[in-house]
Amino acid sequence: MAKTDRSQPSVLARIAAFRTGLSAEASAADYLERQGYRILARRFKTRCGEIDLVAQRDALVAFVEVKARGNVDDAAYAVTPRQQSRIVAAAEAWLSRHPEHAMSELRFDAILIAPNTAPRHLPGAFDATP
C-alpha cells in the first residue's frame, strides 16, 4: 500500500489560497483604477505586516486590504482588529519610505471580493487609532 503524504492537501490548499488572493488583488486594483485611483504599490511587505494595495486619488492615499471569501459578509468579517493593527504598522513603514505622501489625506479601506458579485469598496473601513 502506498504511503500518503498528509501535508499535501495543506500545501495544495495554501497554493489555491495564494492564487485566489492574487486574483482578488488584481480585481480590486482594476476596480480602483476604474474609479480614478492610481496604484502606487501592490503587496507591500514589512516584517510587521503587509498592505495589499496602496492607491492614490488626488490628495488621498488609501491603504487597501483585499478580502476574498465565498460571500461578502464573510469577507467583511475577515479583517480582524489584529490584522488592522498590522496594516497600520505596514502603512507607517510605507510612508517612511515615501515621505512625499506624508502630508496626504490617509485612509484605510477594504475591498471585498466574492463570487458572482462586483467588488465592494469600503472607504474608511477602519482607522489608525488603537
Curated annotation (Swiss-Prot):
Gene3D superfamilies: 3.40.1350.10
Domain of life of the native organism: Bacteria
Pfam families given in the database record: UPF0102 (PF02021)
Sample GO molecular function, one term: nucleic acid binding
SUPFAM superfamilies documented for this protein: Restriction endonuclease-like (SSF52980)
Family of the protein in this entry: Belongs to the UPF0102 family.
Listed name of the protein: UPF0102 protein RPA0323
Taxonomic lineage: Bacteria, Pseudomonadati, Pseudomonadota, Alphaproteobacteria, Hyphomicrobiales
